[in-house]
Amino acid sequence: MSTPAESSDSKSKKDFSTAILERKKSPNRLVVDEAINDDNSVVSLHPATMEKLQLFRGDTILIKGKKRKDTVCIALADETCEEPKIRMNKVVRSNLRVRLGDVISVHQCPDVKYGKRVHILPVDDTVEGVTGNLFDAYLKPYFLEAYRPVRKGDLFLVRGGMRSVEFKVIETDPAEYCVVAPDTEIFCEGEPVKREDEERLDDVGYDDVGGVRKQMAQIRELVELPLRHPQLFKSIGVKPPKGILLYGPPGSGKTLIARAVANETGAFFFCINGPEIMSKLAGESESNLRKAFEEAEKNAPSIIFIDEIDSIAPKREKTNGEVERRIVSQLLTLMDGLKSRAHVIVMGATNRPNSIDPALRRFGRFDREIDIGVPDEIGRLEVLRIHTKNMKLAEDVDLERISKDTHGYVGADLAALCTEAALQCIREKMDVIDLEDDSIDAEILNSMAVTNEHFHTALGNSNPSALRETVVEVPNVSWNDIGGLENVKRELQETVQYPVEHPEKFEKFGMSPSKGVLFYGPPGCGKTLLAKAIANECQANFISVKGPELLTMWFGESEANVREIFDKARQSAPCVLFFDELDSIATQRGGGSGGDGGGAADRVLNQLLTEMDGMNAKKTVFIIGATNRPDIIDSALLRPGRLDQLIYIPLPDEDSRLNIFKAALRKSPIAKDVDIGALAKYTQGFSGADITEICQRACKYAIRENIEKDIEKEKRRSENPEAMEEDGVDEVSEIKAAHFEESMKYARRSVSDADIRKYQAFAQTLQQSRGFGSEFRFENSAGSGATTGVADPFATSAAAAGDDDDLYN
């Protein structure tokens, strides 16, 4: 026996927040296994297990499954059954709502009576076309001399003659469970049971909610404990909590959780949809609320679930209508002024917790507010497994990979993704499916399975719902599309890809990754292109913010826009926020140019600064700014911690120009005699955009020539129909040197020398302001000076650009 101090010490190390979710070990909890003999009323256990539970062969036992379902069976011993397992067939499993591998509990059931009367009806889709008397053909042989136990509400399958028929136990007398003895009367008159009524899909249990393990534990503590064991709270002497407010983005499963809790606790579930309460008559709306609470009290223990609670309980000072205020007051008195409402728990759900009246958000009304957020990778995997458990998946589907690729998706988005993948699978089979036919070939149905390819296509077509407004195309630009700029690419990968792909390394070195990058340089050098490539390469979500869009004419609206964008980015983290033309919103403050709409630009900048620095380190949100006027950007933005890495993107040198030509002409057919190297040599001082322009113009000339040739050919053909075979040769099938020569006549440089001098001067002043420490050495590190002496990698690129033979000879 350990000393109390020790045991309490070991306890304190354990995390108790999810203790309620852990399975309790006890001998009567058994794991479900597949049955060998297929009998609906028999389960088999290992003799040792039966001995532990004090059962004898042939005893009737009560088995409890999920979602408050239970049934009665006969226990048999089976040596081959492993120790903590219980073998049951499919019918029993579906009555208990369990699958193979789930845990059920077994209880003795000594007081089962012989039934006087049972009422049994068939299920409609299994008796179509069955002729003759069902009782004689199916039920009589099934129950004859078998002494089968039945439970009211169970379904069972009877095999007979040609086919099997499913029956449902509608009513049993004298109790819910009884044994059908030879003298029991069996009624089977009545309409067959409809299958739709049976398979209620809204029977969700805890197994159908994924990705919210911690929140689920809190909710079960607050709901199940008071409803099932109220004496726990009594013995300690506290009042059990009364209300829970679930909040989070739409689609994260708030209503689903409430429904699962209601099904699993077996409590009476009363759902109030916010707007339904409202009525045009005075006093009517409040009485509707009162009725709902009264109804719930009558059927205690019960759960009242108010969906979209922000619609009926908005802040009283902000609402104009008298009715809304009265409803809020009524809700407050019902929730707190109640003669301590016994066993009634109120759950509310909303995605705008801050628009609810603050009086509701205190202890005693909504005690606990639980954030049902966007699930992480493990959570997404859980959700995907839940949604695909009934899907027919091919072998190659890699759910873990999919969960890695779906950053920022909530449960609803993942469900949509699975549906989209299934639709994709159906589309492929569309050529063999005829819509007019009444039925589809069984072969086709069996051959359908959702493959990894389908999921990939679906991933391309869907994006997280948090980003629906700022529709984000992850652009199709890869590193190969960008010529040159090797240094910049490496730096970018380190800034953005490492924190997303290797977060554990940053933890190991105890550092939070840098969050911001500013590209500056002459127009047309690929700043925007780089941002697109990084968004594509590192699988993060990508929001592009155009600077001027943020400014609006309304006071305070512009700052709200900035706030909203950052909120969205955090919700769908990891996310790259790309501010193009940053200088339009981040000009130096106090410029007082008079025409900036009452200082709107200054306020936007202040909002930006607070958002960037007040950003939670937990979320991976990167900011990339691009500008070609770095000199007018406010210096507060350029400090480390906001946009810490200032990357100068110079005009391309010869190698880079060659790469840009290659990247631009990657998909075009080019004649053998075109020397791209010569073009690259000749285009000294051209920006990337200028070079692309040259290529486009050359293509245009080739196309023009091609079309002219076609017209000429048509003409010749119409004049001389016989001679058309010979001259199919002189097609213009590629871009020739002549086209490039023609195009070079119109080529122009978009960046003047004066501009370049400006950029380089700026880059060098930055370099000087940064280069203070380049001579620094630790005292005893004479030998390792080589490693520490390397300055910022961009010193080289900026200097190289500067030394480029004084601009260019």
UniProtKB/Swiss-Prot annotation:
Q: Where ATP is bound, by residue?
A: 521-529
Result after altering residue 581 to Q: Abolishes ATPase activity
Q: Which UniProt keywords apply?
A: Acetylation, ATP-binding, Cell cycle, Cell division, Cell membrane, Cytoplasm, Cytoskeleton, Membrane, Nucleotide-binding, Nucleus, Phosphoprotein, Protein transport, Repeat, Transport
Tell me where in this chain the PTM N-acetylserine is found.
2
* Region entry Disordered, spans: 782-809
Enumerate the residues binding ADP.
210, 248-256, 387
Q: Among its keywords, does the record have Repeat?
A: yes
Gene Ontology biological process: cell division; negative regulation of defense response; pollen germination; pollen tube growth; protein destabilization; protein transport
Which compartment or compartments is the protein found in? Nucleus; Cytoplasm, Cytoskeleton, Phragmoplast; Cell membrane
Q: How is it modified after translation?
A: Phosphorylated on at least one threonine residue and on Ser-41 by SERK1.
* SUPFAM superfamilies attached to this UniProt entry: ADC-like, Cdc48 domain 2-like, P-loop containing nucleoside triphosphate hydrolases
An example of a Pfam family matching this protein is CDC48_N
What's the main place this protein lives?
Answer: nucleus
Annotated positions of the Phosphoserine modification: 41
Gene Ontology CC: cytoplasm; cytosol; cytosolic ribosome; Golgi apparatus; lipid droplet; nuclear envelope; nucleolus; nucleus
Topology relative to the lipid bilayer, per the entry, is:
Peripheral membrane protein
NCBIfam families from the entry?
A: CDC48
Functional summary from the UniProt entry: Probably functions in cell division and growth processes. Interacts with certain SNAREs as part of specialized membrane fusion events where vesicles from the same organelle fuse (homotypic fusion).
Q: So what family is this one in?
A: Belongs to the AAA ATPase family.
Entry-linked PANTHER family = AAA-FAMILY ATPASE, CELL DIVISION CONTROL PROTEIN 48 HOMOLOG A
Protein name per the record: Cell division control protein 48 homolog A
